[in-house]
Amino acid sequence: MEAKYLTYFKVENFKRFDSLEVSDIGQFNLVVGDNNVGKTSFLEALLFDEENLGNFLSNLNSVLANRKILGLNNDFTIVDLFAKDPKVSMKYFFQYLNYPEQSELKVSKRLRSSLQTEEIDTVSTKLKLYPDLQFIEFSLGTNKYYIFPGELKLITGYYPYIPFTTIYGNDIVDFFSRLAISSSWLENFKTNLREFIPNLITVELSNAITKESIIVLREQDKDLAQPLAQYGDGTIKLFRYLLELEFCENRRLMIDEIDTGIHYSRLKDFLKKVLQTARNKNVQIFATTHSKECLEYYKQALEDLGLQDSGRVIKIADTKSGIKSFTFNFAQFDNALFAGSEIR
């Protein structure tokens, strides 16, 4: 499967954005900007999936669940909860590397009572199955698709977004158990983890401590296996990122505050491991940071790996004419860092 890297993205009427346009996007994109300017909202906007619209809605519903916000029912739709103006459609414009044409996806809230006769014929089965008062209409090119909130109960899928609060959880137990079936994968995974745990022998699942299986690590000179949850945030984050990159192969992964919990002395090696794994798996990364140290180590990691052409810094700023984005290629943000210019 060919990797799909966004090179251009524009979203309209999404959360606080009337319109946010981002161009010259790279494979690796570090997103910076002031607090509450919309960095996290930008990551959430990137959860669109024009190839699987049900998964797209499920992704946004996962955002709500993660934030402990009311999910979808027959009185609410994604447009109500994510659109700046729920009466207006959300619009996505996007272009992929090696795909010359720009595409548009429109997401609109519709009332059940607004269906025309020909539309009723199209969704007659869904009307019988779901009592929802409202539904979502997707317009992609000349095609239209309809999804009712009740359908989301049947949709389960991987959610390619890592909130900054997410560290250890049952999901990575599931991720690991599915991947560790492969001995070659497990050996490579352990090699990557030894960047942070030099004495690591192996990683395995155990239910000796709790009824549910947990991830434990065995190290040299330690008789007992240690639960992953007892390790530091940096180790657990690397563990999670390496797993999630596997599930995002040939797609994109959004990471909020990628450097939080990572000691500065480990940050460059941490970023190198994440970037190299993403390169190997053809994953496009969008990650936020507030840290100037992270910018500097990101630059050094790209240099060490020879990936300067793939790196970008995207700044989101609240200007007099609204929220805008500014993309810096490697040479531009390298010069800005050298000159001491503030680009965060």
PLM features: what roles do these ranges have?
Residues 1-52, 222-344:
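Switch/communication elements of ASCE P-loop NTPase nucleotide-binding domains
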Residues 2-3, 8, 50-246, 252, ...:
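Phosphate-coordinating catalytic segments in nucleotide- and nucleic-acid-processing enzymes
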